[in-house]
């Protein structure tokens, strides 16, 4: 599919199936702009209206001018749900817009977190806590791209829906950390910057380098917006000298 074409519908979410039921049936991977961003918007919209949803937590870095995400979060708070939103005020070129959105969310009753001192929160996470027959279940959306329905039609990004409890526990820990409640000592599945991510990447690069030295299968495949950390670059270059034909870096 070419970018000039309309984004393809996500097969799992066709036929107007309940979005939570779909996620319970299995994780769903999204690749934008080739796949529609609608399921992401609908995820928040349905959570806002669902009487069994207890809480919604989300990080916002950059949103569209008439954001359906903001509208859904405000509606959720007005419907009596616990809504916590981190609005990053240091998002370059969007500082003023984000202040406006933050005030709108606060007015609707959302608990707004204005980022962490000395850090820029760039992660894109949504956590929905839902009451079900089997107990409380956590639904998570993780993404590389902003919760921006306009740029999602232009930028290449990935996202995933899951209700895997390991991700739910990690997402809860992230929001507790952003809220200042606690700092987790370990993670189930997520790798979180700035404390844990760099060392983890370096250890993974070193592992592949050691495998290459031993003649074992070795591969590094990475996709990123930019690469500027000297140690990561040095490790990657060192590895490519060993097995250049098995390294893929997409910038």
Name each model feature, range by range:
Residues 1-5, 240-249:
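Conserved small/polar residues in nucleotide/adenosyl-binding loops
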Residues 4-220, 229, 237-238:
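N-terminal localization/anchoring segments of enzymes in phospholipid and broader phosphate metabolism
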Residues 224:
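Short, small/polar-rich loop/turn modules that mediate ligand/substrate recognition or access, typified
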């Amino acid at each position: 599919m070419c970018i000039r074409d309309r984004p393809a519908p996500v097969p799992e979410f066709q036929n107007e199936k309940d979005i939570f039921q779909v996620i319970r049936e299995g994780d769903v991977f999204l690749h934008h702009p080739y796949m529609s961003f609608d399921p992401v918007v609908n995820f928040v919209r349905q959570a806002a209206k669902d009487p069994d949803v207890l809480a919604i937590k989300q990080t916002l870095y950059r949103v569209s001018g008439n954001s359906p995400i903001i509208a859904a979060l405000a509606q959720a708070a007005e419907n009596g749900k616990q809504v916590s939103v981190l609005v990053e005020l240091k998002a370059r070129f969007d500082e003023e817009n984000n202040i406006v959105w933050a005030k709108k969310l606060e007015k609707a009753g959302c608990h707004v977190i204005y980022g962490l001192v000395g850090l820029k929160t760039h992660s894109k996470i949504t956590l929905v806590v839902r009451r079900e027959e089997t107990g409380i279940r956590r639904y998570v959306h993780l993404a590389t791209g902003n919760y921006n329905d306009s740029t999602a039609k232009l930028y290449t990004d990935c996202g995933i829906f899951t209700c895997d409890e390991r991700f739910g526990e990690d997402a809860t820990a992230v929001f507790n950390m952003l809220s200042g409640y606690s700092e987790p000592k370990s993670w189930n599945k997520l790798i979180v910057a700035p404390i844990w991510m760099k060392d983890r990447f370096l250890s993974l690069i070193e592992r592949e380098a050691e495998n290459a030295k031993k003649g074992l299968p070795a591969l590094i495949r990475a996709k990123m917006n930019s690469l500027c950390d000297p140690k990561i670059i040095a490790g990657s270059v060192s590895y490519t000298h060993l097995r250049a034909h098995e390294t893929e870096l997409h910038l």
